[in-house]
């Protein structure tokens, strides 16, 4: 039993003699290497005679992959941006204390400036309000006194107007500009080179247009005579040519007079014709009748129609009144 167990142990774990062999081999190899290293000729022979150890392709590929990965990792680490957000001063820095002192001084100065500004603004507003109140009271007092003075004097205060009168004629050397002839002036600065005409003539005038304007104004003033205009109006009114109603009435009156004259002439001609017919003498031709005169009625017929604007005959008025009453 013991032998079988020993054999099993040798098979599984190995014997002591087998374990000691590699150590002996290693010691011999080490001794050989030491002897070769001590002899230089042996070392040279080993260098020239020993074949070059070739590394397998898989090992090369593994090494190249590792080198590429290490290089890419280095590049990535260089290209990455590192952002550091600090919530406070870094105590590891040497100038941390100086930075703390600067920050505290800046915050304190800003607070002082803000407080000073608010205090100044408050004082300014208070002083301005007080001044406005005092000025308002003073103005009220002045206006009250002026109103009382005007009421006592009975004079109504006039509205304030500007000091410049735009309608007033301009004056040059105590003479109106419309009465000055530019040709008479010795100095004519607007003729100098580089002069601006708008400094001497307004509303786009120049020397020549201004002279024309002055002559036209002078002519209008001469033609405008209020007394002469009033006399002309009075003469027109006396002649009846001023109103259109007077003109129509005068024209109607002239027409009526002409018609009456024509009627009288026709009646006289009719009587003469009757006398001539009875005496046997030939009748002369009757004169032409006025175009506005209606034709003469026949004997025994109705009386002639009245002309427009004339009174009807007296014998027709009672008949018309009777007809109106019957209606």
From Swiss-Prot:
Present with 1310 molecules/cell in log phase SD medium. Residues 282-311 have a biased composition (Pro residues). Residues 312-327 have a biased composition (Low complexity). The gene is FIP1. The keyword Disulfide bond does not apply. Component of the cleavage and polyadenylation factor (CPF) complex, which is composed of PTI1, SYC1, SSU72, GLC7, MPE1, REF2, PFS2, PTA1, YSH1/BRR5, SWD2, CFT2/YDH1, YTH1, CFT1/YHH1, FIP1 and PAP1. In the CPF complex probably interacts directly with PAP1 and YTH1. Interacts with RNA14. It comes from Saccharomyces cerevisiae (strain ATCC 204508 / S288c) (Baker's yeast). Circular dichroism measurements suggest that the protein is largely unstructured in the absence of interaction with PAP1. Keywords: mRNA processing, Nucleus, Phosphoprotein. This is Pre-mRNA polyadenylation factor FIP1. The keyword Phosphoprotein applies. One of its GO terms (biological process) is termination of RNA polymerase II transcription, poly(A)-coupled. One of its GO terms (molecular function) is protein-macromolecule adaptor activity. Belongs to the FIP1 family. Polymerase-regulating component of the cleavage and polyadenylation factor (CPF) complex, which plays a key role in polyadenylation-dependent pre-mRNA 3'-end formation and cooperates with cleavage factors including the CFIA complex and NAB4/CFIB. Pre-mRNA polyadenylation factor that directly interacts with poly(A) polymerase PAP1. This inhibits the extension of an oligo(A) primer by limiting access of the RNA substrate to the C-terminal RNA binding domain of PAP1. Seems to tether PAP1 to the cleavage factor I. Residues 64-81 have a biased composition (Acidic residues). GO terms for cellular component: mRNA cleavage and polyadenylation specificity factor complex; nucleus. Residues 1-82, 272-327 are annotated as: Disordered. Pfam families: Fip1.
